[in-house]
């Protein structure tokens, strides 16, 4: 029941001709022109985004070293301040133990350390 090759080719040509008759060639040209215009715009957008990414990468490289050094500086300052406040607390407690009358009642508890605890989460 299979058709011979010439009949199949003729049937395929007929189907193709009917499909071509359904669509206007002017419409196909307009679609291709619109697609070409869109392709150009997408390529321009891609070029702009690529340039922006390269610029952002360069800016990040410049800033990241500075940011890392500032972070290290802040961490060392925090460690230094923690050490200083630890020494101050121990000095205050030794003073309070040696000279209990030097501080009024309750004043020592208020002045021991009024800094907020930065390690605990905020409520």
Curated annotation (Swiss-Prot):
UniProt note on tissues of expression: Mostly expressed in leaves blades and leaves sheaths and, to a lower extent, in seedings, roots, collars and panicles.
Pfam families linked: KxDL (PF10241)
InterPro entries: KXD1-like, KxDL_dom
Keywords: Cytoplasm, Nucleus
Listed GO CC annotations: BORC complex; cytoplasm; nucleus
Main location, first listed in the record: nucleus
Motif KxDL boundaries: 78-81
Subcellular compartments: Nucleus; Cytoplasm
GO molecular function, one term: protein homodimerization activity
Domain of life: Eukaryota
GO aspect biological process, one term: lysosome localization
Family membership: Belongs to the KXD1 family.
Quaternary structure (record): Homodimer. Component of a nuclear cell elongation controlling complex made of ILI5/BUL1, LO9-177 and BC1. Binds directly to ILI5/BUL1, ILI4/BU1, BUL2 and BUL3. Binds to BC1 in the nucleus. Interacts with BCL1.
Its job: Contributes, together with ILI5/BUL1 and BC1, to the promotion of leaf inclination and grain size by modulating cell elongation.
Protein name: KxDL motif-containing protein LO9-177
Species the sequence originates in: Oryza sativa subsp. japonica (Rice)
């Amino acid at each position: 029941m299979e058709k011979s090759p010439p009949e199949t080719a003729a049937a395929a040509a007929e189907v193709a001709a009917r499909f071509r008759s359904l669509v206007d060639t002017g419409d196909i040209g307009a679609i291709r022109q619109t697609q070409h215009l869109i392709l150009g715009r997408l390529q321009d957008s891609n070029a702009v985004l690529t340039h922006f990414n390269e610029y952002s990468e360069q800016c990040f490289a410049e800033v990241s070293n500075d940011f890392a050094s500032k972070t290290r500086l802040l961490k060392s300052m925090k460690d230094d301040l923690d050490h200083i406040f630890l020494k101050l607390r121990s000095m205050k407690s030794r003073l309070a133990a040696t000279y209990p009358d030097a501080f009024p009642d309750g004043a020592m508890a208020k002045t021991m350390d009024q800094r907020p605890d930065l390690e605990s989460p905020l409520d």
